[in-house]
């Protein structure tokens, strides 16, 4: 699924049921999708594109319809270990799936470490500026939700749209890759004051030159 609220809710549902979830790009080629399915033997594939043959698959709308038939009370907790697996092309070019051998959620100690590394704190206004199938945006998004942050999810990662959202919603926390940082400062009529609400800014996903850091 793309970055939509259903994706977030589904991840929590999978963890609540003790499952491991594998976020995949909504643009993944059919061949790679089948390789992933063969590797992990999924109990369920949720996709709004084509459904892989031989595997139980639902669209997000079908999932919502089925969910309405279930009672509202929460099921008992089941520890989800591993909680997450990421896909990688590896050196061979063949799709590989790498499990994250840890439980879903964060301990108090884990959040303290996260605060020290990321600068995040509780109840911030946060913008998700990367796809959930990538490790860093995924970690930032869910750790933010664990901290009670309000998470704003843009429909695209266009530089102008990102600046507009930061200004409109007075975003306090955002993580970006250097390529997006570069696109933003090169925008025509870019006004640094549009970003004045930002209190914490993190970058990852590539080398960030000293010159680009100084400009920011």
What feature does the model see in each segment?
Residues 34, 61-82, 108:
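Flexible, low-complexity linker/hinge segments
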Residues 83-109:
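Conserved AMP-binding A3 loop
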Residues 2, 50-53, 171-215:
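Adenylate-forming
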Residues 108-125, 133-173, 187:
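Conserved AMP-binding/adenylation subdomain of ANL enzymes
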Residues 1, 22-35, 149-169, 180:
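ATP-dependent adenylate-forming carboxylate-activation enzymes
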Residues 14, 87-91, 126, 132, ...:
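Conserved S/T- and glycine-rich ATP-binding loop of Class I adenylate-forming
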Residues 1-27:
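Conserved AMP-binding/adenylate-forming
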């Amino acid at each position: 699924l793309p970055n939509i609220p259903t994706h977030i809710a589904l991840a929590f549902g999978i963890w609540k049921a003790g499952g491991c979830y594998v976020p995949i790009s909504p643009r993944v080629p059919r061949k790679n999708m089948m390789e992933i399915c063969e590797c992990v033997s999924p109990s369920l594939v949720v996709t709004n594109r084509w459904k892989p043959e031989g595997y139980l698959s639902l669209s997000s709308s079908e999932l919502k319809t089925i969910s309405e038939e279930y009672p509202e009370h929460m099921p008992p907790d089941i520890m989800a270990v591993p909680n997450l697996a990421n896909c990688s092309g590896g050196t061979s070019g063949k799709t590989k799936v790498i499990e994250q051998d840890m439980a879903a959620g964060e301990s108090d100690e884990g959040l303290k470490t996260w605060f020290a590394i990321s600068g995040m704190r509780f109840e911030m206004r946060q913008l998700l500026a990367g796809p959930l199938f990538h490790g860093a945006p995924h970690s930032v998004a869910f750790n933010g939700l664990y901290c009670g942050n309000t998470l704003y999810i843009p429909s695209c990662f266009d530089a102008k749209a990102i600046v507009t959202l930061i200004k409109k919603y007075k975003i306090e926390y955002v993580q970006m890759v250097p390529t997006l940082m570069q696109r933003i400062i090169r925008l025509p009529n870019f006004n640094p004051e549009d970003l004045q609400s930002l209190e914490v800014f993190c970058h990852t996903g590539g080398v960030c030159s000293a010159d680009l850091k100084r400009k920011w």
